[in-house]
Amino acid sequence: MVRGLLVKGGSTRSAYYYDPQKGFPFGHSFTKRYSNDELQEHLILLEARARIGMNKKNCPEHVSSIFDYAFSEMLNNAIEHSHSKQITVSLVLDEATLRFVVEDTGVGVFNSIVKKKRLANNTEAIQDLMKGKTTTAPQAHSGEGIFFTSKCADVFQLQSGETELHISNGKTQELSINSLKPKKRGTRVIFSVSIHSTRHISDIFRAYQT
């Protein structure tokens, strides 16, 4: 949700607002805008981890693995598919939570899927994404990145155009499709996972892959 110039992250009980141009307001934070010119996500990942001081003492290995996968997948989507000239990443690591945002001003994830798959609207694009098999460039990517990233998160938000997909993974998964005002040009991904999460990415892959 966007309120004025602030972006809302998290669920209702743990909501927070931040300026995407400045990054998160607390914890070990890092924000940087990159020119989308031969970017390599693994190098940005290494830089981001170093800048927020991420290590085994403040982030368990299984949570670190979730972050590495989710951040790399969402950044790869922006690099390969958005056609955006610039990509902005924001991260924060505090005593309870690891969060990141990947944002571009490109074609927009829902709009791209609607056009490529000749769907009626953004809701149909979301339904297709949640099947776990969708990509707008199948020769370049498996298309499962958004699906599995949404399963790894405590809270996952995918915002583009007039639409937000909001997923909360507690004892059960809660999924909602919300209206965005003002509209989001391009795509914004907001990902949050607890440092104390018991999820393991290998278990998530086993649960949903056949």
Regions found by a protein language model. Name each.
Residues 59-95, 146, 150-152:
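Conserved ATP-binding N-box helix of the HATPase_c
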Residues 94-97, 107, 168-171, 201-203:
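Regulatory and interdomain segments flanking nucleotide-handling catalytic cores
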Residues 2-3, 7-72, 203-210:
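Bergerat-fold GHKL ATPase/HATPase_c domain
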Residues 104:
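Acidic ATP/Mg2+-coordinating residue in the GHKL
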